[in-house]
Amino acid sequence: MQSGKLHRYGETDGKLSPVSALEAAFAAELGLPYCVALNSCGSSMFVALKSAGVMPGDAVLSNCFTLAPVPGALAHAGARPVLVDVCDDYTIDLADLVRKARSSGAKTLLLSHMRGHICDMQRLSEVCAEQGIALIEDCAHTMGAGWAGRATGTWGLAGCFSLQSYKHANSGEGGLLVTRDPDLAARAILYSGSYMFYAAHGARPDEAVFERWKYNTPNFSLRMGNLPAALALPQLGPLLADRGRRWNQRYHWLSQALAGTPGLTVPARPAQEQYVASSLQFSLPGLAPAAIQGFLALCAGRGLHIKWFGAVEPKGFTSVWQHWRFFGEPQLLPNAERVMAGLCDMRLPLTLSEPDCQAIAAVVRDSLAQVLAAQA
């Protein structure tokens, strides 16, 4: 603010802009050579798809359990979505992925680590290799997380991270695209809106790579500004790791307090999944929609607001594939339909104490017990 340099590009004194410094720091955090900062994670997914060569009309696979920016990125790229079913633990169904890849001919997968739930990434990588699929990871909910010691965002062709206010690093809004592919990085920088200032980037490929792309890559003006970058940069490194530890502590407190609640399940997390749980999901299997609405109302009456993925209408941030009518005819996803019908979602603010988590669990248990008793 003191410098007045809120835009990342222009004549400078040779110093890295805050955006370029953020790109360099985040690339180093993940051990990757390239990072491109954009104005949102949705923009980073769109740019990743374009930079990977996805053309209008191309089939792109994507797990159906996600939030609206993912189908939005597919629509923005003009892709034809091929939605993949989910398992009971909310992760992508790898058997259905193989079936859909073979039947559709799709060669790109936009994988959403929705609400921080990470599938078996080793097996997924094998499936992608077997089917000739390029993997792009939506890591909006997994900054700092990984599978078997390897960070999300580093398993495929590109990873896309969010800096939106409810994510693991908060600059209000913003997206970070990471890759080890120099051509994808150069194209992403040019698509983001670098003009011919790409040399000012902090984690970029060599000039020769840009020469291959700079004359035939449009400027979409999706770049990040210096203000959100300046907010995000200090939150990386030790602070990011500390927040992950604190979120997981709260997840442990609440999941343990909910364990054994009649009519409620919290999926087990595999030992290989190094999650960062900024939210908690649970299922109410077999409970009728009216009963779930009653449960939610009882919780809300005691100050606990829970989101529900089985609602007929989209609400707030919450929607499911049946609501995305811009995709055309709804795709049949039988297991997801059953799972989403009872799926509930709660954020875990870092201000929660262990007694707070116990109190939340008590509200959930008591409210659900009332609903189940009324059905008996």
Give the role of each language-model region.
Residues T142-A148, W155-S278:
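Active-site region of PLP-dependent enzymes
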Residues H7-D13, S17-A59, A73-A77, L83, ...:
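Phosphate-binding glycine-rich loop
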Residues M1-T12, W213-N216, R347:
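N-terminal "arm"/small-domain region of PLP-dependent enzymes with the aminotransferase-like
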Residues S162, P270, A277-A288, F309, ...:
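Conserved PLP-binding active-site segment of the aspartate aminotransferase-like
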Residues D89-S171, L176-L184:
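Active-site phosphate-binding strand-loop segment of PLP-dependent enzymes
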Residues A48-R102, C299:
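Conserved PLP-anchoring active-site segment centered on the Schiff-base-forming lysine
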Residues M196-A208, W253-Q256, G294-L333, R338-L343, ...:
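Conserved PLP cofactor-binding pocket of PLP-dependent enzymes
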